[in-house]
Amino acid sequence: MSFIPHDLGRQGEHTAVTFLIEKGYRILQRNYRHRRNEIDIIALDRRTLCFIEVKTRSSASKGHPLEAVTPEKQKEIIRAATAYLSAYPSPEPDCRFDVIAIIAHDFTNGRIREFKLEHITNAFMT
């Protein structure tokens, strides 16, 4: 069965959310959009507000998922985070930008069955 990249990305985000919850994060929002910018996951890690980008690939043959978080993509995430924070009750919390990279070794029937997940905290700065 062939896969649709959008389905792989959606399953990657679901896998990331499950991972974060197991690590004790509280998920506040998924797929937050501000204009053309999006943040995949917004979560609390204790008292730190985390803006998390998830990149999923079916293999590393087309490059590691982290390579897709380019400086331009980082700027887009920062713009969306700034918009999110403008509506946040003050005082603003400590914030950080994380990236979760997933390589799905087995993606069948629309589900990721085997994968390698890498969570990079403080992956980039403003």
UniProtKB/Swiss-Prot annotation:
Highest rank taxon of the organism: Bacteria
Molecular function terms, GO-annotated: nucleic acid binding
Pfam families cross-referenced by the UniProt entry: UPF0102
Family the UniProt entry places it in: Belongs to the UPF0102 family.
NCBIfam families tied to this protein: PRK12497.1-3, PRK12497.3-3, YraN family protein
Official protein name in the record: UPF0102 protein Cphamn1_0017
Organism for this UniProt entry: Chlorobium phaeobacteroides (strain BS1)
